[in-house]
Amino acid sequence: MTNIRKTHPLMKILNDAFIDLPTPSNISSWWNFGSLLGLCLIMQILTGLFLAMHYTPDTSTAFSSVAHICRDVNYGWFIRYLHANGASMFFICLYAHIGRGLYYGSYMFQETWNIGVLLLLTVMATAFVGYVLPWGQMSFWGATVITNLLSAIPYIGTTLVEWIWGGFSVDKATLTRFFAFHFILPFIITALAAVHLLFLHETGSNNPTGIPSNMDMIPFHPYYTIKDILGALFLILTLLALTLFTPDLLGDPDNYTPANPLSTPAHIKPEWYFLFAYAILRSIPNKLGGVLALLLSILILVFIPMLQTSKQRSMMFRPFSQLLFWTLIADLLTLTWIGGQPVEHPYIIVGQLASILYFFLILVLMPTVSLIENKLLKW
């Protein structure tokens, strides 16, 4: 008799996705991050659900309800910090996953890649609206500054901003709708992730060499299930260490002050995972220009497959491209650092140079160097 997992309509889908899936035999630990992102998503939905049971999305009680969760709810502090630091782990995995895709040429699976970019934007939106919910100073002013960027859109900008706010400033209506968005978006992310996986399984996984591996595949289970479990243990260990020893390491002290529209914090800045984009936004001394640069800094990922000039898919055998890739990573780290600094000399000029380098590397240097490497192949 055939095993039920191969015949049952539902089990068959799971079987083909996680058990009998033919997988390249040589994929490295950089391929772990997909499953880790799935784990992060499940953890965030569960911790978020329990937080939502005690949270009140109202300006007069939101801050107090978060304090109540931390003080009076059984293990409420633990759930709250797991959720806050879980977001950081989510973005670490997300950036590692994208970096892997860029390095090994996974972006040549265009449908998978484009849905991935859509997922990135959705996760960023979810994190942004989530950061507003505790209704601390940085929540309020972050929401004010970022939503205000839409006013740079010609003609309809101001109307659009007031429509999103639900009034003439960030207030009750804004908080309520942001809570609604924050609740629904993770389920949209889950659906998108399923489609992401569907498209990936149409082609099969890429591998470090970038060479088709159809002749050398192994079943996902037990080889990669055990490998993913190891990655998951590392992730959980890191998250628990962060949550139990330094829960506020990545947060902003300003968010422990209740939101006050009459007093602006000295330095308004987003969470660490948005700092690189924030630095690019600030590096252009024009509102519309900054907003466009901010958008392009993320949407540039959509154009990566079109900028592929190399005859080789992966960077594994391309030392010059590798050098530029790691320069790009260093540049992004520099932008992240600059995004957290005040707007003064020398940070302004460093941020502007790093922003120019970011776009120059992706749009000019990397495609050019790939062409040079193609020539070197003939030597």
Curated annotation (Swiss-Prot):
Annotated cofactor note: Binds 2 heme b groups non-covalently.
Q: Which gene encodes it?
A: MT-CYB
Q: Which Gene3D superfamilies match?
A: Cytochrome Bc1 Complex, Chain C (1.20.810.10)
Which named protein is this? Cytochrome b
Question: So what family is this one in?
Answer: Belongs to the cytochrome b family.
According to its UniProt entry, the function of this protein is described as:
Component of the ubiquinol-cytochrome c reductase complex (complex III or cytochrome b-c1 complex) that is part of the mitochondrial respiratory chain. The b-c1 complex mediates electron transfer from ubiquinol to cytochrome c. Contributes to the generation of a proton gradient across the mitochondrial membrane that is then used for ATP synthesis.
Q: Which amino acid positions bind a ubiquinone, per UniProt?
A: H201
> What residues does heme b b562 bind to?
H83, H182
| Topology in the lipid bilayer | Multi-pass membrane protein
UniProt GO MF annotations: metal ion binding; ubiquinol-cytochrome-c reductase activity
The places in or outside the cell where this protein is found are:
Mitochondrion inner membrane
Q: Which GO terms describe its cellular component?
A: mitochondrial inner membrane; respiratory chain complex III
